[in-house]
Amino acid sequence: MNSKFTWLDSYFYNPNLIQKCLAFLLLPLSALYLVLAVLNSKFRKKQDFKIPMISVGNLTVGGSGKTPMCKAIAKFLKKECLKQEIYIVLRGYKRQSKGLKVVKFKDEILCSVNESGDEAMEYAYCEDISCVIVSENRSKGILEAKKLGAQVILLDDAFSKFHIKKFDILLENTIRPYFNFTLPSGAYRLPLCYKKNADFVALEGDDFLRYSMCKENMKAILVTAIAKPFRLYEHFIKARACYFFKDHYKFKKEELQNLLKKHNCDTLMPTFKDFVKVKDMGFKTQIIELNIELKDKLKNAIKKYIKDSDEACKN
């Protein structure tokens, strides 16, 4: 695909007239979805796993920077909170395996990207994260993390897991959906009023800064399969051509070879999430690094939570 917006991105963030009409036609389904989501949140009893847990989530579908935020928090926990055994538990979206799987333990990666999913494999390459566990059942993943020796557990995309007692960081980005509807008429998985359930609403610019790095290379083509690829807009002019695929797309070697040949290029310019899927294909790569810097208010909130949790666990 060769557009800044996939169809879904356009539908949720920059809809044309037909997409707007479709959104209104789907409102009855959104109402049903909303009722089910609210019921799920109200009647789940919270379970305390007796270990510090930080969840990074958002209200909308698609990318919001959860992965770089989790990596930034892991780095902060290790450097400033003196926590060495930082584990992460996530679903492992679009992986070709089922059930609980330990992707990384200590410094050893234990499975392929197909088995782990691209997000989990990106975490596996993060030196600040000691263990990566994928599991559709987060509770089972948490128990496995405790058994393996976790000091702090990060939960990727777990804001909606209301049955787990945790410190919820909710990311709020500067780019917001066109409509404030829940799925399928809008991009929201939960209504906006659920922001009040978060322990910390992290506003881009106020509580964290997002930055990315990559040098210009006119012998490269930018290829990515992340949600909201327009987030990479500053890098579009750094490559000879740009190709955007659906989120979590599994790249094919021949397909990428043809794109390089078409533009007379010799280098791919992927994000790290894309890189883990193409690294064994033999291509020359120049990675776009997506990073987040935590600001003091968020750092202090995390520090206080860790301190309070450590004291509670001792009692």
Task: Please provide the spans of the model-predicted regions.
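Residue-level signal for inorganic ion chemistry
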Residues: 32, 67, 123, 156, ...
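Walker A (P-loop) phosphate-binding motif
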Residues: 38-107, 207-211, 315
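Generic hydrophobic alpha-helical segments
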Residues: 73, 138-145, 256-259, 302
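Generic structural signal for residues in well-ordered beta-strands
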Residues: 86, 131-132, 285
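A transmembrane-helix-recognition feature enriched in membrane-embedded lipid enzymes
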Residues: 2-53
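Phosphate/Mg2+-binding loops and adjacent switch elements
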Residues: 94-208
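ATP-dependent carboxylate-amine ligase
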Residues: 1-12, 19, 79, 83, ...
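Short, well-ordered alpha-helices that flank and scaffold nucleotide-derived cofactor binding pockets
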Residues: 71, 75-79, 125, 144-147, ...
